[in-house]
Amino acid sequence: MEQAPENQGPQREPYNEWTLELLEELKSEAVRHFPRIWLHSLGQHIYKTYGDTWTGVEALIRILQQLLFIHFRIGCQHSRIGITRQRRARNGASRS
């Protein structure tokens, strides 16, 4: 029966270090796109809900990822990523 190899490959960074680095990257990106008061309020909400726990960190990461994804998908003014806004004919003449 096959067994998984033990400790082969490069050593992985500890989960908590990786998580905190990811959170810092997301926060620095979010500050470029959203008002600081919104982000501060989000942080306060997370802190009130989860306290100072890893669950709160994970929740904040998840929410920031979702906010940034939607922001870019809708069409950030600073980015080329997103939906291109096109004018549509009202009579449907552009449909094939």
Curated annotation (Swiss-Prot):
Pfam families on file: VPR
InterPro entries: RetroV_VpR/X
GO biological-process terms attached to the record: DNA-templated transcription; monoatomic ion transmembrane transport; protein homooligomerization; regulation of DNA-templated transcription; symbiont entry into host cell; symbiont-mediated activation of host apoptosis; symbiont-mediated arrest of host cell cycle during G2/M transition; viral penetration into host nucleus
Compartment(s) of residence: Virion; Host nucleus; Host extracellular space
Residues with Phosphoserine modification: 79, 94, 96
Keyword line: Activator, AIDS, Apoptosis, Cell cycle, Host G2/M cell cycle arrest by virus, Host nucleus, Host-virus interaction, Ion channel, Ion transport, Modulation of host cell cycle by virus, Phosphoprotein, Transcription, Transcription regulation, Transport, Viral penetration into host nucleus, Virion, Virus entry into host cell
Domain of life: Viruses
Sequence segments annotated as region (Homooligomerization): 1-42
Main location: virion
Cellular-component GO terms for this entry: host cell; host cell nucleus; host extracellular space; virion component
Post-translational modification comment from the UniProt entry: Phosphorylated on several residues by host. These phosphorylations regulate VPR activity for the nuclear import of the HIV-1 pre-integration complex.
Membrane-crossing segments per the record: none
Function summary: During virus replication, may deplete host UNG protein, and incude G2-M cell cycle arrest. Acts by targeting specific host proteins for degradation by the 26S proteasome, through association with the cellular CUL4A-DDB1 E3 ligase complex by direct interaction with host VPRPB/DCAF-1. Cell cycle arrest reportedly occurs within hours of infection and is not blocked by antiviral agents, suggesting that it is initiated by the VPR carried into the virion. Additionally, VPR induces apoptosis in a cell cycle dependent manner suggesting that these two effects are mechanistically linked. During virus entry, plays a role in the transport of the viral pre-integration (PIC) complex to the host nucleus. This function is crucial for viral infection of non-dividing macrophages. May act directly at the nuclear pore complex, by binding nucleoporins phenylalanine-glycine (FG)-repeat regions.
Subunit (UniProt): Homooligomer, may form homodimer. Interacts with p6-gag region of the Pr55 Gag precursor protein through a (Leu-X-X)4 motif near the C-terminus of the P6gag protein. Interacts with host UNG. May interact with host RAD23A/HHR23A. Interacts with host VPRBP/DCAF1, leading to hijack the CUL4A-RBX1-DDB1-DCAF1/VPRBP complex, mediating ubiquitination of host proteins such as TERT and ZGPAT and arrest of the cell cycle in G2 phase.
Family membership: Belongs to the HIV-1 VPR protein family.
Extra remark: HIV-1 lineages are divided in three main groups, M (for Major), O (for Outlier), and N (for New, or Non-M, Non-O). The vast majority of strains found worldwide belong to the group M. Group O seems to be endemic to and largely confined to Cameroon and neighboring countries in West Central Africa, where these viruses represent a small minority of HIV-1 strains. The group N is represented by a limited number of isolates from Cameroonian persons. The group M is further subdivided in 9 clades or subtypes (A to D, F to H, J and K).
Protein name per Swiss-Prot or TrEMBL: Protein Vpr
Lineage: Viruses, Riboviria, Pararnavirae, Artverviricota, Revtraviricetes
Gene responsible for this protein: vpr
